[in-house]
């Protein structure tokens, strides 16, 4: 039942004392100076843990630096060596020292004095937006085109009436779209949020050095583009509140029109929010609404021209899985087009990471169980506020990444000799169906020499914007601090699913915390490990069962096994998945390669040897398979490169060791491996810029590796494999379900049937991981099958219809798809 602590063994142990920016066992309202609150843990710390915490606590990493490869000039800009040492600040801790006044009355009125002294006035914000947008050339052309469609053969008088009608429609759309920022409303909301946030959050932490970089960026008189991850509805208010507290003007926030509800919509407009449709193609016949697109484009251009700040959520909607979702770059493309048209000199891009101990929504179990999303209403907002006031949601951490120049990024990308990326079908089909002729890859083999690098080329423009969006989301996700609830939920699901004594859980929590810091991710908590664990368990609530044992002052902690509870734990556990995802991919690939070697008849000690090249290729193919689960790596790196680097880390950890030369000479690839190697060099998984002297040289590719058999390393590999267990089980179950496919069938209907199948597996205890039945994984699996060519998608009366492609009509090919996915699944 009890397992030893998770560790990777020989990681660099140059530990440094950590700064005590904030601690869970201390007062909520303190800032730089902390005072003990007398919180006592429920059991005594062991001497071993005391020794570890005093000697092994790492220094916090500084997160959010921009990409040196893509934006080398921005890397040096706004940053100086003293910034990381500025430390953290609790934004909602306000007293008279944060105002110009002192004394008893100032202490009583500190919130009012603070918001009154903030620098916010009408002159900061955009003016005459509606008239300027309506008079822009693009909008005028769209109005004329729509009017011509309404009255194709009419007289000049009728045409004039049609134009006036379209103009009235355009003005009505802009009334919903254009925000009218009110400094008074911002101040009032700032005061209200200080009260509310102090009621249901312990604190909201920001890094003072990061805010210094943002302030420096505001002094350039360039538009700023804030691009946060999207976890909760509070995200909309959080950024505006933090910037207001630091005398930075509020950004204009792109909000979905589902929030356009009475009273609440007026508040959002006054705070800088503007509503946009979730789908731009909303004409009755399904065509592009050119008028709406022109107005949206003109609105964004006008805001940027007036040097306003924008806030866009690239994910489009709140993440229901706890992972950062894939980017939707629609509005970002408007920003890129504005810069490309030389309307403004440059735009500074700021990715933002946001982490919650517990989101105010609590969970998204209803939607993950397949229930339709409830429409927002004034009543639902009021109920949400009342519910929030009854609970405490712990800690919030907001991280602003280093601003980088969008102009520098775009110019750099247009000069890079990078070939067109492979589609998922081109990348994965040779691995799934190795006997199939690889005609598709051959057609694109020499694409790098003929490909247009002109930003005016539509295909290149789309890829450029998609890569930019992935780059931003990867940086924002990398900046997200890991919260205590993330680590505890992860340990309970994938380390101690059958339960664990609290003392052992605390030990494992401490070790995992150190592993997170070792990978250059920051933590959203500090303090004694047992205090932090108890804090997390309290926030996880009914998802965790606590049982008193016969041992004095000891408790047994068990994760709840009900489907909603497992879904909720998985949501919070996914907050730490991106820290270990590449290592988890390598761990599953090790299993796949060893399993294939064993099934191929290898025996004895040589059967444990792995070709490094084969392992890297296997891992790269798994990266492609999981690419719909979020941004796995920076787009300026190939999957091959990232996997190769991660294998190098495994060698550094001691999990993999390079085999002796005598052993390597005794190993020769089997026939299947030779065919695999012949096929894959045609695929551009490696960068064209690699040279013979790089780490990817032939001497590296030819080496063989041994897997460490130490208990410590084997347990860590098992932990990593379990992290991907729910994803791989969902994908393999979807592949099983494809065997009985009878189509064509509407995609929505197929999603419901597949989801019902996965839920049934869970209810009957067939599933190893109950969380494999979440609706998010169902959608991602079906999307992956469309991307790799299992399904063909057609539109019938604006409804997406699925049918099997000719490649996967034979049952044998569907079986190979299943076998390919199962090769990574550790039973």
Curated annotation (Swiss-Prot):
Please indicate if the UniProt record lists Cell membrane as a keyword.
no
Annotated catalysed reactions: sn-glycerol 3-phosphate + an acyl-CoA = a 1-acyl-sn-glycero-3-phosphate + CoA; (9Z,12Z)-octadecadienoyl-CoA + sn-glycerol 3-phosphate = 1-(9Z,12Z)-octadecadienoyl-sn-glycero-3-phosphate + CoA; sn-glycerol 3-phosphate + (9Z)-octadecenoyl-CoA = 1-(9Z-octadecenoyl)-sn-glycero-3-phosphate + CoA; sn-glycerol 3-phosphate + octadecanoyl-CoA = 1-octadecanoyl-sn-glycero-3-phosphate + CoA
Superkingdom of source: Eukaryota
Q: Which GO terms describe its biological process?
A: activated T cell proliferation; activation-induced cell death of T cells; acyl-CoA metabolic process; CDP-diacylglycerol biosynthetic process; defense response to virus; diacylglycerol biosynthetic process; fatty acid homeostasis; fatty acid metabolic process
Where in or outside the cell is it found? Mitochondrion outer membrane
EC assignment:
2.3.1.15
**Gene Ontology CC terms, in alphabetical order:** endoplasmic reticulum membrane; mitochondrial inner membrane; mitochondrial outer membrane; mitochondrion; plasma membrane
Give me the ranges of the annotated region Important for mitochondrial localization. Answer: 80-120
Residues found modified as Phosphoserine: 380, 687, 694
- Which residues does the entry place in the Cytoplasmic compartment? 1-87, 119-827
Q: Where is this motif: HXXXXD motif?
A: 230-235
Q: Name one GO molecular function term.
A: glycerol-3-phosphate O-acyltransferase activity
- Membrane topology value: Peripheral membrane protein
Q: Its biological function?
A: Mitochondrial membrane protein that catalyzes the essential first step of biosynthesis of glycerolipids such as triglycerides, phosphatidic acids and lysophosphatidic acids. Esterifies acyl-group from acyl-coenzyme A (acyl-CoA) to the sn-1 position of glycerol-3-phosphate, to produce lysophosphatidic acid. Has a narrow hydrophobic binding cleft that selects for a linear acyl chain. Catalytic activity is higher for substrates with a 16-carbon acyl chain.
| Annotated protein name in UniProt | Glycerol-3-phosphate acyltransferase 1, mitochondrial
């Amino acid at each position: 039942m009890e397992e030893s602590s998770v560790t990777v063994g020989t990681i660099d142990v140059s530990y440094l004392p950590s700064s005590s920016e904030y601690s869970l066992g201390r007062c909520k309202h303190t800032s730089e100076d902390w005072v003990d609150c007398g919180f006592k843990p429920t059991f005594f710390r062991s001497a071993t843990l005391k020794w570890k915490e005093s000697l092994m606590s790492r220094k916090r990493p500084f997160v959010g630096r921009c990409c040196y490869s893509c934006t080398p000039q921005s890397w040096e800009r706004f940053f100086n060596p003293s910034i990381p040492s500025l430390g953290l600040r609790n934004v909602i801790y306000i007293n008279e020292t944060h105002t110009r006044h002192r004394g008893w009355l100032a202490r009583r009125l500190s919130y009012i004095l603070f918001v009154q002294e903030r620098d916010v006035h009408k002159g900061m914000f955009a003016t005459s937006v509606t008239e300027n947008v309506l008079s822009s050339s693009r909008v005028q052309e769209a109005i004329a085109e729509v009017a011509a469609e309404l009255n194709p053969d009419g007289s000049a008088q009728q045409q004039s009436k049609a134009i006036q009608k379209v103009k009235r429609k355009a003005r009505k759309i802009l009334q919903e779209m254009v925000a009218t920022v009110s400094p008074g409303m911002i101040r009032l909301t700032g005061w209200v949020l200080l009260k509310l946030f102090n009621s249901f959050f312990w604190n909201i932490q920001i890094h003072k050095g990061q805010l210094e970089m943002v302030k420096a960026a505001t002094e350039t008189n360039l538009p700023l583009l804030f691009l946060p991850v999207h976890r909760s509805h509070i995200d909309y208010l959080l950024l505006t509140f933090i910037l207001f507290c630091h005398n930075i003007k509020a950004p204009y926030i792109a909000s979905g029109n589902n929030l356009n509800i009475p009273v609440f919509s007026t508040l959002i407009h006054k705070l800088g929010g503007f509503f946009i449709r979730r789908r731009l193609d909303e004409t009755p016949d399904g065509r592009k609404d050119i008028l709406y697109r022109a107005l949206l484009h003109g609105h964004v251009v006008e805001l940027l021209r007036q040097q306003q700040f924008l806030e866009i959520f690239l994910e489009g909607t709140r993440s229901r899985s706890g992972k950062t979702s894939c980017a939707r770059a629609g509005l970002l493309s408007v920003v890129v087009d504005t810069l490309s048209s030389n309307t403004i000199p440059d735009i500074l891009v700021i990715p933002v990471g946001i982490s919650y101990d517990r989101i105010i929504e609590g969970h998204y179990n209803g939607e993950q169980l397949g229930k339709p999303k409830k429409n927002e209403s004034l009543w639902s907002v009021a109920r949400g506020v009342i519910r929030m006031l009854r609970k405490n949601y712990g800690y919030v951490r907001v991280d602003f990444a280093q601003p980088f120049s969008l102009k520098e990024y775009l110019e750099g990308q247009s000069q890079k000799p990078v070939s067109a990326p492979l589609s998922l079908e081109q990348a994965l089909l040779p691995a799934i169906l190795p006997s199939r002729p690889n005609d598709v890859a051959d057609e694109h083999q020499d694409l790098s020499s003929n490909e247009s690098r002109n930003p005016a080329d539509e295909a290149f423009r789309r890829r450029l914007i998609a890569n930019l969006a992935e780059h931003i989301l990867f940086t924002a996700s990398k900046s997200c601090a890991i919260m205590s609830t993330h680590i505890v939920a992860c340990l309970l699901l994938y380390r101690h699913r059958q339960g664990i004594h609290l003392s052992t859980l605390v030990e494992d929590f401490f070790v995992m915390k150190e592993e997170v810091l070792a990978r250059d991710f920051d933590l959203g908590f500090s303090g004694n490990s047992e205090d932090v664990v108890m804090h997390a368990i309290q926030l996880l609530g009914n998802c965790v069962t606590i049982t008193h044992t016969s041992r004095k002052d000891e408790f047994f902690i068990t994760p709840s096994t009900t489907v909603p509870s497992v879904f909720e734990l998985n949501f919070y556990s996914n907050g730490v998945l991106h820290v270990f995802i590449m290592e988890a991919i390598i761990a599953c690939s090790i299993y796949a390669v060893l399993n294939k070697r064993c099934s191929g008849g290898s025996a004895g000690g040589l059967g444990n040897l792995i070709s490094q090249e084969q392992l890297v290729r296997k891992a790269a193919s798994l990266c492609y398979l999981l690419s719909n689960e979020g941004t796995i790596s920076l787009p300026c790196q190939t999957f091959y490169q990232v996997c190769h680097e991660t294998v190098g880390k495994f060698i550094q950890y001691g999990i993999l060791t390079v085999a002796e030369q005598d052993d390597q000479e005794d190993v020769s690839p089997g026939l299947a491996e030779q065919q695999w190697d012949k096929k894959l060099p045609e695929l551009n998984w490696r960068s064209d810029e690699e040279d013979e002297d790089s780490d990817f040289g032939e001497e590296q590719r030819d080496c063989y590796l041994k897997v460490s058999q130490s208990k410590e390393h084997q347990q860590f590999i098992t932990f990593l494999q379990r992290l991907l267990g729910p994803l791989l089980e969902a994908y393999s179950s979807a592949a099983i379900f494809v065997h009985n496919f009878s189509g064509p069938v509407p995609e929505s209907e197929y999603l419901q049937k597949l989801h019902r199948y996965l839920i049934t597996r869970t209810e009957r205890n067939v599933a190893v991981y109950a969380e494999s039945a979440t609706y998010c994984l169902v959608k991602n699996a079906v999307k992956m099958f469309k991307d790799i060519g299992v399904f063909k998608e057609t539109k019938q009366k604006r409804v997406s219809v699925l049918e099997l492609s000719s490649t996967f009509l034979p049952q044998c090919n569907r079986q190979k798809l299943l076998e390919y996915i199962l090769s990574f699944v550790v039973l």
